[in-house]
């Protein structure tokens, strides 16, 4: 299994629709102002956060249970900047839609710009033949409110291609998050 380069990422995005919309270069400015970078890097792709967020709240005094998740645990928010309360959590989604080839597995890591501020981005791997918008998990580990910027980079996806095609892909087993469109809450 080997990591894939910028050339491979560009080819797969442009010829096979692996990432849509796709940015073939690295974008660091928008309208003359510096932003958290996104787009193709040497061995990965920096994804952007869309403007749809679900922010944890305790106003309804629910219990967080991954097997029986209560949607009242979140407040929906739409905007260019999301403020995550101290020691709290928010969900978002990528601006990019992914179609992962059968021979590929991805690993997604948070960007150091956010990590150095105590904001941790967690995303599980994109499995072979999974497709959809990626649900992003942001943890504010600080005692202060933290900003997340929509339309800017938030994490980097690394692509690994196996030397052997898997017997059963995510699509084959009817994965529960296949084709997800918006911010998707836990399912069992």
Curated annotation (Swiss-Prot):
Broad EC category: hydrolase
Domain of life from the UniProt record: Bacteria
Membrane found in the keyword field: no
UniProt function note: Catalyzes the deamination of dCTP to dUTP.
Pfam families associated with the record: DCD (PF22769)
Binding site residues for dCTP: 111-116, 135-137, 156, 170, 180
Pathway given in the UniProt record: Pyrimidine metabolism; dUMP biosynthesis; dUMP from dCTP (dUTP route): step 1/2
Lineage: Bacteria, Pseudomonadati, Pseudomonadota, Betaproteobacteria, Burkholderiales
GO MF terms, alphabetically ordered: dCTP deaminase activity; nucleotide binding
Disulfides per UniProt: none
Entry keywords, A to Z: Hydrolase, Nucleotide metabolism, Nucleotide-binding
Catalytic reaction list: dCTP + H2O + H(+) = dUTP + NH4(+)
Keyword Membrane appears in the UniProt entry: no
InterPro entries: dCTP_deaminase, dUTPase-like_sf, dUTPase_trimeric
Protein name: dCTP deaminase
Binding partners and assembly: Homotrimer.
């Amino acid at each position: 299994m080997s990591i894939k380069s910028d050339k491979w990422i560009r080819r797969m995005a442009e010829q096979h629709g692996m990432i849509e919309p796709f940015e073939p270069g690295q974008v660091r400015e928008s309208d003359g102002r510096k932003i958290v970078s996104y787009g193709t890097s040497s061995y990965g792709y920096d994804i952007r956060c869309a403007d749809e967020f679900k922010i944890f709240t305790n106003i309804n005094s629910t219990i967080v249970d991954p097997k029986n998740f209560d949607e009242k645990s979140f407040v929906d928010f739409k905007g260019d900047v999301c403020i995550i309360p101290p020691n709290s959590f928010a969900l978002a989604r990528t601006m990019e839609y992914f179609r992962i080839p059968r021979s590929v597995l991805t690993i997604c890591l948070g960007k150091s710009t956010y990590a150095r501020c105590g904001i941790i981005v967690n995303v599980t791997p994109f499995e072979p033949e999974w497709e959809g918008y990626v649900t992003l998990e942001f943890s504010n580990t600080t005692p202060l409110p933290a900003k997340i910027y929509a339309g800017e980079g938030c994490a980097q996806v690394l692509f690994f291609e196996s030397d052997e095609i898997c017997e059963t892909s995510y699509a084959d087993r009817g994965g529960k998050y296949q084709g997800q469109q918006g911010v998707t809450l836990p399912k069992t």
